[in-house]
């Protein structure tokens, strides 16, 4: 029977994953809070102490730092000497390590954190197990992100958990532990940057960097311009997160944390033109992110507009010469690698909230056409583009999009009809190829009726209302194609 060690601070999906492992004939070992949760869920699990024959001591500071754990993880199974030594010491092989670390970054994000609290959230045993298992990836599967649970299970069931895939998991581990260690260094070095002011001039503010990874705002290389402001940093982060969702050339413009224009194209110049045309008024004074290098031609387009920040993976020398003619525009060079961090947090009175990032993308094949009329190919393309954008828009959110750009955005309204009115009234075009995209379900048929009055012929929404049928009936009445995704994307 294969053995797995599970010890996680982020408990998302761990019960379901553990149950599936037991069904796949894994014997589970765990520690502390993870074991308690599995016990409460009636998942068969043993204590790591059963492997080490040594109790957890010092309030859990020492529990997995033991040869019985690390010998079982590190043994090279192609070396008889290693296997003989394990046998002599009565040490079992460990086949899988599932670990994520104490929430150090979240803890030190609290401005009132004490030194003792920070120190207690420095994980020792977790990184040690992760690095040991990652080093021995040829024989051991290492999982650090809950987002990988399903893929691992699928590969276990299909007997395709091969060395190449384990190597990809190994890379994630070393990226994760490197970022974790860097966050610790930055905290104790006091790596914080005082900003001119916060969201408003009467608010003081500073920027604490917990990572300088090249794919983050904190690790961006600023090539030109004034110091980033508090609002610049927030808007730039939102802009970067959205543009990274696109594989094709894409441009995103953001104002006040909401996209005002998103465009794609065969070239980055074309993509930006589509984003600009989506709302040529609101882009003024905004933040623009591009997922391709800025060329001289694109630089001329960007130079003609007042922008606060321009983000790209690269700027050519000639493009820089053009853009630097404006002394205040901030130019940020950022790696467009997808951020591996799966959690985000926000402070509230007396504490903070932590959640997984809303990165889930519903596959098209899991979406369901619920109306008599099915979407055309062009309507599908419009829906899928809008569905990538809508999680980045404050709720209640309604987007209108075609297959190359957003054409109208209604953001942050207290009711869905109000958001739809704004999007429809501000739309640069409405025709049979434009889709209406909603971040939440329709509580009744009035939004669909309003869309029909403006000529909309395709709608995509999560579904899930007790009155879904009212919206479906209204769509059928007006010959509108409607797709439901089963997943909502509220943003507050």
From Swiss-Prot:
Catalytic reaction annotation: (6R)-10-formyltetrahydrofolate + 5-amino-1-(5-phospho-beta-D-ribosyl)imidazole-4-carboxamide = 5-formamido-1-(5-phospho-D-ribosyl)imidazole-4-carboxamide + (6S)-5,6,7,8-tetrahydrofolate; IMP + H2O = 5-formamido-1-(5-phospho-D-ribosyl)imidazole-4-carboxamide
GO molecular function: IMP cyclohydrolase activity; phosphoribosylaminoimidazolecarboxamide formyltransferase activity
Residues in MGS-like domain copies: 1-144
Protein name per its UniProtKB record: Bifunctional purine biosynthesis protein PurH
Alphabetical keyword list: Hydrolase, Multifunctional enzyme, Purine biosynthesis, Transferase
Pathway recorded for this protein: Purine metabolism; IMP biosynthesis via de novo pathway; 5-formamido-1-(5-phospho-D-ribosyl)imidazole-4-carboxamide from 5-amino-1-(5-phospho-D-ribosyl)imidazole-4-carboxamide (10-formyl THF route): step 1/1; Purine metabolism; IMP biosynthesis via de novo pathway; IMP from 5-formamido-1-(5-phospho-D-ribosyl)imidazole-4-carboxamide: step 1/1
Organism: Staphylococcus aureus (strain bovine RF122 / ET3-1)
GO CC aspect terms: cytosol
Domain of life: Bacteria
Gene Ontology biological process: 'de novo' IMP biosynthetic process
Domain observations: The IMP cyclohydrolase activity resides in the N-terminal region.
Family statement: Belongs to the PurH family.
Pfam families for the chain: AICARFT_IMPCHas, MGS
E.C. number(s) listed in UniProt: 2.1.2.3, 3.5.4.10
Annotated InterPro entries: AICAR_Tfase_dup_dom_sf, Cytidine_deaminase-like, MGS-like_dom, MGS-like_dom_sf, PurH-like
Gene3D superfamilies reported in the protein's UniProt record: 3.40.140.20, Methylglyoxal synthase-like domain
């Amino acid at each position: 029977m294969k053995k797995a060690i599970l010890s996680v601070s982020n408990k998302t999906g761990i019960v379901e994953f553990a149950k599936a492992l037991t069904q796949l004939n894994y014997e589970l070992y765990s520690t502390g809070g993870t074991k308690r949760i599995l016990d409460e869920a009636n998942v068969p699990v043993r204590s790591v102490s059963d492997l080490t024959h040594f109790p957890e001591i010092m309030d859990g500071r020492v529990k997995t730092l033991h040869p019985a754990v690390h010998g079982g993880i590190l043994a090279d199974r192609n070396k008889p000497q290693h296997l003989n030594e394990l046998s002599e010491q009565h040490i079992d092989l460990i086949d899988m390590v599932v670990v994520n670390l104490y929430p150090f970054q979240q803890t030190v994000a609290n401005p009132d954190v004490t030194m003792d609290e920070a120190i207690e959230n420095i994980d020792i045993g977790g990184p040690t197990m992760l690095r040991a298992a990652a080093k021995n990836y040829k024989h051991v599967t290492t999982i650090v992100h809950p987002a990988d649970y399903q893929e691992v299970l699928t590969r276990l069931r299909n007997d395709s958990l091969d060395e190449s895939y384990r190597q990809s998991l190994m890379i994630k581990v070393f990226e994760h532990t490197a970022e974790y260690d860097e966050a610790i260094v930055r905290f104790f070095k006091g790596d914080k940057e005082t900003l001119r002011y916060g969201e408003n001039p009467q608010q003081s503010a500073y920027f604490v960097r917990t990572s300088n990874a090249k794919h983050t705002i904190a690790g961006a290389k600023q090539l030109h311009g004034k110091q980033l402001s508090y609002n610049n940093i927030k808007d730039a982060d939102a802009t970067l997160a959205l543009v990274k969702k696109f594989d094709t050339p894409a441009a995103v413009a953001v104002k006040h944390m909401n996209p005002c224009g998103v465009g794609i194209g065969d070239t980055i110049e074309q993509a930006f033109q589509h984003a600009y045309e989506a709302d040529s008024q609101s882009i003024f004074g905004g933040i623009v992110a591009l997922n391709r290098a800025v060329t001289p031609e694109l630089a001329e387009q960007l130079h003609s507009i007042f922008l606060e920040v321009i983000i790209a993976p690269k700027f050519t020398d000639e493009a820089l010469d053009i853009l630097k003619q404006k002394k205040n525009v901030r130019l940020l060079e950022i790696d467009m690698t997808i951020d591996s961090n799966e959690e985000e947090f926000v402070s509230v009175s007396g504490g903070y909230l932590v959640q997984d990032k809303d990165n889930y993308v519903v596959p098209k094949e899991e979406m369901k056409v619920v109306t008599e009329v099915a979407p055309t190919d062009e309507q599908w393309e419009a829906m899928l583009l809008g569905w990538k954008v809508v999680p980045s828009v404050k709720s209640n959110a309604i987007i209108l999009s075609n297959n190359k750009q957003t054409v109208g955005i209604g953001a942050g309204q207290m009711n869905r009809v109000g958001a739809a009115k704004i999007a429809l009234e501000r739309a640069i075009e409405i025709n049979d190829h434009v889709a209406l995209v909603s971040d939440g379900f329709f509580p009744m048929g009035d939004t669909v009726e309003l869309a029909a009055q403006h000529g909309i012929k395709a709608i995509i929404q999560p579904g899930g209302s007790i009155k879904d049928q009212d919206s479906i009936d209204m769509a059928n009445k007006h010959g509108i194609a409607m797709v439901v995704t089963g997943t909502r994307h509220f943003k507050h």
